[in-house]
Swiss-Prot record:
Described function: Involved in targeting and insertion of nascent membrane proteins into the cytoplasmic membrane. Binds to the hydrophobic signal sequence of the ribosome-nascent chain (RNC) as it emerges from the ribosomes. The SRP-RNC complex is then targeted to the cytoplasmic membrane where it interacts with the SRP receptor FtsY.
Organism: Saccharolobus islandicus (strain M.14.25 / Kamchatka #1) (Sulfolobus islandicus)
Assembly: Part of the signal recognition particle protein translocation system, which is composed of SRP and FtsY. Archaeal SRP consists of a 7S RNA molecule of 300 nucleotides and two protein subunits: SRP54 and SRP19.
Name of the protein this chain belongs to: Signal recognition particle 54 kDa protein
Keyword RNA-binding: yes
Domain of life, source organism: Archaea
């Protein structure tokens, strides 16, 4: 799946096929690749319908070529398919923090317990593992081996068949030993199709332990079948989250991810390999970047991000012109950085309406700030303190000398930046006064 879509992106961006035909071919390849990854057919066609709808309704930003804009829409909609902007919180909300892992037989739950313990140990937490899977004979030995490998203590009672009793004793022991995070590996005796029994058992252990987090472990190879299990789990345990394992060993990973995301459940981690450190926090946008080929779309995403940041600053400029708030050198810095992300300044400035108002300068054409001047100004801004950026009026000759020395510039460079900043504020006040005069002339505000 990943390779096919990545190749399609590269072909689309570099090929000479006419735009409309290239879009149709790409959409067909996207549908084919997603369906072969076991993504639900309805979800696939809903996705491509949304892409086409946006293509027809929206106008491409001036800083993006049409093909770049199309790929940015594909990226956005695919990200929504796999969970959108939801960023899972992996930090414990209290200490000790008790995590209970559940999952059907063969899901990779015990291995994931070890990976999770290693993840938190690397972050500086004291971690303990509780082996409460009493139905699989090798579960305790496997967890003990993992614990020894990563230097994490394991509590277990190989001759005790009471999972709840073991779990409670293990948690109590680690609480007394002042462990920060306690991970309980519960039984995985039920197979897929026996979700009801699994969830009933989960509730029993939950009531006994009152854990702070319940995590369901799902094998990616079940593809879209993950929907039923994730849906029931999400309804039974709203505080719970999900780990999808074995993403590296199946073509159905996309199907499992999209199915779980469709339930509204939070995907916290994905397992990306067999090694103990191959567990990563799930981020839908990062995952989609990988699918589309990070090298091919990185510059597009950078331009889109720059445009979004620029529009935020532009909104603030408009507020200042309306007399709301003030513009600081911190805003100027953010504006320049946003423009740099959108491409070469000489090209970007030509495509931004009203930039003469946004970036006025007394000595050059308002639409063409030189790269060298921008470089010097950024160096000066980087050498200023927080107070100086927020309140430039405090910058006297002594501060100018310090800023110049810290940035490798002349004092005149710093003075020029401050003059430009002051002229910009004067211009904004003029615009505000002119707007006020027009409002009075017409008896009120005009849109």
């Amino acid at each position: 799946m990943l390779e096919n879509i990545r190749d399609a992106v590269r072909k689309f961006l570099t090929g000479s096929t006419p735009y409309e035909k290239a879009v149709d071919e790409f959409v067909k390849e996207l549908q084919k690749s997603l369906i072969s990854s076991d993504v639900n057919v309805k979800l696939v066609f809903s996705l491509t319908a949304k892409i086409k709808e946006r293509l027809n309704k929206e106008k491409p930003p001036s800083v993006l070529e049409r093909k770049e804009w199309f790929i940015s829409i594909v990226y956005d909609e695919l990200s929504k398919l796999f969970g959108g902007d939801k960023e899972p919180n992996v930090n414990p909300t209290k200490l000790p923090f008790i995590i209970m892992l559940v999952g059907v037989q063969g899901s990779g739950k015990t291995t994931t317990s070890g990976k999770l313990a290693y993840f938190y140990k690397r972050r500086g937490y004291k971690v303990g593992l509780v082996a409460a899977d009493v139905y699989r004979p090798a579960a305790y030995d496997q967890l003990l081996q993992l614990g020894n490998q990563i230097g994490v203590p394991v509590y277990g009672e190989p001759n005790n068949q009471n999972a709840i009793e073991i779990a409670k004793k293990g948690v109590d022991t680690f609480v007394k030993n002042k462990m920060d995070i306690i991970i309980v590996d519960t039984a995985g005796r039920h197979g897929y199709g026996e979700e009801t029994k699994l969830l009933e058992e989960m509730k029993e252990i939950y009531e006994a332990l009152k854990p702070d987090d319940v995590i369901l472990v799902i094998d990616a190879s079940i593809g879209q079948k993950a929907y039923d299990l994730a849906s029931r789990f999400h309804q039974a345990s709203p505080i719970g989250s999900i780990i999808i394992t074995k993403m590296d060993g199946t073509a159905k990973g996309g199907g499992a991810l999209s199915a779980v995301a469709a339930t509204g459940a939070t995907i916290k981690f994905i397992g990306t390999g067999e090694k103990i450190d191959e567990l990563e926090i799930f981020n839908a946008k990062r995952y989609v970047s990988r699918i589309l080929g990070m090298g091919d779309i990185e510059s597009i995403l950078e331009k889109v991000k720059g445009l979004e940041e620029y529009e935020k600053i532009q909104k603030k400029m408009e507020d200042v012109m309306e007399g709301k708030g003030k513009l600081t050198l911190r805003d100027v810095y953010a504006q320049i950085m946003a423009l740099r992300k959108m491409g070469p300044l000489s090209k970007v400035l030509q495509h931004i309406p009203g930039l003469g108002v946004m970036l006025p300068t007394p000595s050059e054409d308002q639409l063409k700030l030189g790269e060298e001047k921008i470089r010097r100004w950024l160096a000066a801004l980087n050498s200023m303190t927080y107070k100086e950026l927020e309140n430039p009026s405090i910058i006297d000759k002594s501060r100018m000398r310090r800023i110049a020395e810290g940035s490798g510039l002349e004092v005149e460079d710093v003075r020029e930046l401050l003059e430009w900043y002051n002229n910009m504020n004067k211009l904004l006040k003029m615009v505000k006064r002119r707007r006020g005069s027009i409002d009075k002339l017409f008896g009120g505000k005009i849109g």
